[in-house]
Structure formats: C-alpha cells, structure tokens
Amino acid sequence: MKSPTPALMLQGTSSNAGKSILTAAFCRILLQDGYRVAPFKAQNMALNSHVTADGLELGRAQAVQAAACRLDVDVRMNPVLLKPNSDTGSQVVVMGRPVGNMRVREYMAYKPVAFDAARAAYDSLAADVDVMVLEGAGSPAEVNLKAHDIVNMAMARHAEAKVLLVGDIDRGGVFASLVGTMELLDPWERDLVAGFVLNKFRGDATLLSPAYDVVTGRTGKPFLGVVPWLHDLGLPDEDSVSFRETLAGRAPDVPAGGGMLDIVLVDLPHISNFTDLDALRREPDVAVRVVRSPEQLGSPDAIILPGSKNTLGDLAALRSRGMAEALCALRSADGGHLGPVIVGICGGFQMMGRLLADPQGVESDHARTEAGLGLLPVTTEMGSAKVLRRTSAKTVSGWCGAGVAAGLMPGTGGGHGGAEACPGEGYAVHGYEIHHGVTTPDAGGGAVLVCLHESDGSPAGWTTPDGQVWGTYLHGVFDADGFRRGWLDALRVRRGLEPVGRIVARYDLDPALDRLADAVRGAVDMTHVYSLLGLPPQG
C-alpha cells in the first residue's frame, strides 16, 4: 500500500488567527525548497470566492494559496464552499457548483455527502504532488460542532496530517486558548497536534519563554515558532473581520489639497469579494475606508458599492440605515461636477439599477420585485442559473470611469494630461463573474452607455453619459494596473490635482508571497517541520 502524501495542517484556536496566511507561507516555503506542493481546505465558509479557468467556484483564500504554490487554481483545493446568504443559511457549493441553499440543520444532514466529496478531492489532489498543506476552519475545539466536523481533525485524520495549532497572541489570552483547546480535544485529536505556533507577535519574543514551559508542561506539545506582526504584506485579507478592522476608523475626509484620493467602500451585511479593493489599497495616493452610515460618508472622490450574496436584503439594509437616500443625494444633477464617482460591482451594480426582480425566489423563499437606487437606468432579473466565468474586457475608447466633468472623455479637452490618461485603444481588464441574474438597459428609461466590452462586443459594463455612475459584474476590474491608474488619475483631475501619469503600484502577489515566506521561515523551526513531514530540506 502506498504511503500517504506527507501533509502539514494549520488549525487555529479561533477564527482570524492567521491560518490562511500561514498556509500560504508554508506553501511558498516548500515550493522554494523544491517540492511540488498544493493547498487544501475541505470546507470554507466565505463570501470571497474565485472562479477557475473551467468556470468552477472556490474560496479566494485557496486561490491565493495556489498562487503561493505557483499552481493554476483547482477546485479540488476547496471542494466545499459555504456562502452565507442569511443569519441561518448558506448557498452550498460542492466541487465548484451550487447544489442549493440550506439552513443549518439541512446542511448537517447533507454533511456526509460533502465529506465524501472532500475526501475524494483531497486524495486526487494529493496524488499529484509531493506534499500537501491543509487549512482548518475556526477552532477544532467547538464542542457543539465536533460531531459534524469535516474540516479540522476529521480531515487531519484522513490526510494523516501533522497539525500545527496557531494562536493569535495580539488579542491576548493566547496561552489559555492553547491549553483550553487541547483540553477540549479528544485523545486521538490531541495525538494529531505536533506543536504550537504563535502569530501576530509584537515585542521581545525572549520574554515568552516562561509561558512556553508552562504550556508545554501541561500539554506535552512544543512551540515551533513565533511569527511577528507583518505590516503591509500586500496580500488579501483572509475574511471580512480582518478587512473591516483594517479599514475601520479612517478619517472621514482627506484634507483639501493633500494630494490623497478618498475612496469609500459601502459596507453591506452580506458583503462579498471585498478583495476587489485590494489593488486600490496598494496605491500610495489613495485612502480606502469602510462606511456604514451617512454620517461617515464625508466628501469622497469615489464611492464603491461592492458585491453581495443577498442583494435584495442588503439593499433593504441600505435603506434602513439612510444610506440609499444619501447615495442618491450625492448623485449631482449638474453633470457630475461636484458629486463623487459612484461605482457598483456585481451585487452593488444590481442595486444601482432602477429595478431588481427575483421571480423565482433565488435570494429568498418567495418571488419579489424591488425598486433599486435608480442611479443607472438598468433592470436586473435574478435567475436560478449561476454565471461563473473568467472574463477579459476592454474599456471603451477614451473612457476612464470618472466622467466628462474633468474633461477626460473624447472631444472635451481637459488639460492636466487628461487625454494621455485615457488611451484611444482602451484599457485591457481581466477578472471573473459570479452572479445570479441578467442586467439589461431600460428601453426608454434614460441614457446609458457601454463602458466595458468583451472581444465579441458584448457589454461588460455600463455608465451614465456624464460618467459619474458606472457598474460592472467584473470582479477584479481594478486589478489591471493601467486601468486602475488611469481611473485614479481621472479622479485626481476632477479634484484639481495633477495626474501621476504612470503606474506606481503593481498588483502582483508573487513578491508579496516571497516576503511572507521569508518572514515565516525566519520565525519557525523549519528543521522540525521537515522532520515531522519525514522530508529533507531542499534548496
């Protein structure tokens, strides 16, 4: 009988302990040392997802981990994806395709089927590589959930993985969390734990030695490393908790004449694919902040309505908070000279339209039709078929996504180098679509222009004639360095600032993954890790 593929698994004492990032780090370290390595997470609960080349959906974190391995994204890396669409239910995606919406008890009954799919995916993927790096979810010691576990110790046992238990020391109480987690594990689960890793440490690590002795004395498990707090990694946040924490509390306005652009992301209860903002956050002349109420809006240069897993529900939330009225009020009536540019992506794009219809009850248990924000004269009809595809598109000649008010559209002049900022041949953009529903311009409902188109001429984005409002289904539209800088420079001209005129920040995860790997390699006893895996270091 063939020996199992060596496997390392990162589990945590809590959510947001850093499992996803550390999984990516170990993937890149093993790759650097000459091993064929692949990531795996049996079940991911996330609204950040990614589409494979063959049109299948999986968690975004596994796409980043695949990049760490320099592999194409493969749905086997995350065979089960749960996308919450209410407080008690989720869309269940198995091997990249939705199998239905389920409430908690329904999914509990379905879990044996999901676990079969996860094990089969793991076995198939593991057969293709030298070593696997698995990621757990939440905590393995949730006593009310352990009986139905398919992602933590049950998966570790199937993979015969060596488990490293990760604790977030920045939040305090990490040693109690480690000991408490071990106490709540069954004996066979404790046997799978090979050691502890502390994450997000700030300070002098030598001061931790007394705690090591106490915890190791109680658990019999060694500490294999202390990973420092890593600033500005340039990698996507692993979940909405860390994303919101990162961007919360920013100043509501950029000082006039300060040279920085103020870009606002409207928070949604079921926000999805907030990684669409990652590339903008890397730009040195941009401040991105999350807002939840009209009072927080200030006077931004641009407002982005992001994707949503429950578009109609999140639209209702915007209305109840007063945000819908505030956004409409910011849509200036004088051709966009004063108001911010308003951008909708996927669900946010649907919300900006005149009407949203859900005749099949895709997002709820009954058919309904709701008025949209009315910012774009388009109508969306939800459908049971889910669009999952990668898309390449080009901007319409001369369009920069910031409107004619700044003189950046063809034939308007504008100065400040604006004409050079919007090339006649258009910008190439690439991304992916994940949505239910089809959006079409209203017949006679007001002017709307195509601003993005695919190679066959199919529209991929729409804008008002003045360019102040535009929307697209294309996730990753701002990842394109040229378009992103052109859009930002157009915003700068609207503000009366000089355009930068060149790409200053490239959105490239590979150097960031190398920096991450270097930091973790220097903080963790890799000789011990290799001995656990039964592998010699290579380099």
Curated annotation (Swiss-Prot):
Stated name of the protein: Cobyric acid synthase
UniProt entry tagged with the keyword Iron: no
Catalytic residues as annotated in Swiss-Prot or TrEMBL: 346 (nucleophile), 475
Entry-linked Gene3D superfamilies: 3.40.50.880, P-loop containing nucleotide triphosphate hydrolases
Gene Ontology BP, a term: cobalamin biosynthetic process
Family membership: Belongs to the CobB/CobQ family. CobQ subfamily.
Functional note: Catalyzes amidations at positions B, D, E, and G on adenosylcobyrinic A,C-diamide. NH(2) groups are provided by glutamine, and one molecule of ATP is hydrogenolyzed for each amidation.
InterPro entries reported for this sequence: Class_I_gatase-like, CobQ/CobB/MinD/ParA_Nub-bd_dom, CobQ_GATase1, CobQ_N, CobQ_synth, GATase_3, P-loop_NTPase
UniProt GO molecular function: ABC-type vitamin B12 transporter activity; catalytic activity
Source organism (scientific name): Nitratidesulfovibrio vulgaris (strain DP4)
Domain of life: Bacteria
HAMAP family per UniProt: CobQ (MF_00028)
Keyword Kinase included in the entry's annotation: no
Domain GATase cobBQ-type positions: 260-483
Pathway noted in the entry: Cofactor biosynthesis; adenosylcobalamin biosynthesis
Pfam families: CbiA (PF01656), GATase_3 (PF07685)
Record keywords: Cobalamin biosynthesis, Glutamine amidotransferase
